[in-house]
Structure formats: C-alpha cells, structure tokens
C-alpha cells in the first residue's frame, strides 16, 4: 500500500516469525512438484508462496478457494498453502501426518517475513500518536496476559465459540494458541 501512495505506520508487530508453509500430499518437497495443482486462498495473501514456487519454473497451477484445506484433504490438489497455526493443524486433524520433507516452511528457508502487525495510516498516526501508543501497549499487555494465563484465555474464547456455535473445540484452540504464541518469539 505504501508503494501505491498510501503511507502506513506499523504500531505493533505481534508476530516475529512467518507461519506460512506449503504442504504437499506425497511426501516430496513442495518446491519440486512439476505442474502441481496448489491450493491457495482467494484473499491474495499468497504472493510470497506464488513467487517462490513460480521462480522455480515448475509450471504450477494455482487453485484459489475460500477454504483450500478441503481441496487438499479431498485429494483434488497436490499441495496447499497453509498457516502453521490454522490449516496445518486442520490437515493433521483430518488424519494426515505430513513428513518434514513435505512441509516447506518459509521462515526456515530465508523468507521469514513478519506477519500479524497492526497498521494505521501515517496521517492518522501523526495526529494521534498518544492514542496509537496506548493502543499498542494495551494490545501487547493483552498478549502477555494470554501467554501467562492460557487456560483462562481459552475459557474466554470457548465462551464465544459456544455463544456463536463455531465449529471448533478446546483442543484445537489450545494448539492454535500455542503456535501463535511461539510465532511471537524472536527466533533470530
């Protein structure tokens, strides 16, 4: 967005590590699959995955879906883009146990692009520095509280899961939380 003339300011970076992976079905390194069908989100958050795979000249076909995990589990694609705290857990929950060779972790291969930041327009930031700082500090304190009180945090999440009848369970939410918290640690 900055290149498009819309300057942004990052006021809080919660994730220090990339959660993005590509998972292949057949135990091979996803970057070696020629003419593979690769499932990805329709949201446009897959530019890094597309550029890494496309740069290898493998002729991959990108299949956009609202929920690419379903295509992967059904065997309709050879690989899928996933996040370690979400889709990778769902793949495992569906009974797949991907080998380490079949998971390309961007963070471990020179593409550790930080995710999950809080941004605002530069003009808003310049007019509201104190408010932005207070928001960032409160958000950080919230994450610190969650790290110190994971079961209480899960109680809160599960109350909303029950209220809004969301299809998940405490075990999945605990695994997601553990992964999200691990991504917040600086591994460098």
Report residues per predicted region.
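Structured segments of extracytoplasmic/periplasmic soluble domains
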Residues: 1-4, 41, 52-56, 71, ...
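Periplasmic-binding protein-like
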Residues: 14-23, 97-125, 132, 136, ...
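Short phosphate-engaging motifs
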Residues: 29, 45, 87, 131, ...
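Secondary-structure boundary/capping signal
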Residues: 57-60, 99, 165-168
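Secondary-structure end/capping motifs
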Residues: 127-188
């Amino acid at each position: 967005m900055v290149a498009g003339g819309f300057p942004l300011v990052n006021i809080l970076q919660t994730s220090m590590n990339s959660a993005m992976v590509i998972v292949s079905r057949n135990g091979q390194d996803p970057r070696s699959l020629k003419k593979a069908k690769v499932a990805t989100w329709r949201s446009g958050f897959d530019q890094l995955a597309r550029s890494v795979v496309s740069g290898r000249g493998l002729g991959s076909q990108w299949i956009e879906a609202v929920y690419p995990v379903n295509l992967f589990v059904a065997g309709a694609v050879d690989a899928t883009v996933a996040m370690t705290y979400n889709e990778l857990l769902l793949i495992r929950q569906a009974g797949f146990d991907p080998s380490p060779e079949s998971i390309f972790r961007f963070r471990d291969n020179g593409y550790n692009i930080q995710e999950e930041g809080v941004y605002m327009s530069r003009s808003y930031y310049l007019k509201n520095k104190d408010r932005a700082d207070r928001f960032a500090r409160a958000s950080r304190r919230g994450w610190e509280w969650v790290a110190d009180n994971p079961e209480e945090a899960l109680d809160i999440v599960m109350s909303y899961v029950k209220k809004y009848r969301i299809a998940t369970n405490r075990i999945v939410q605990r695994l997601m939380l553990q992964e999200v918290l691990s991504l917040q640690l600086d591994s460098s």
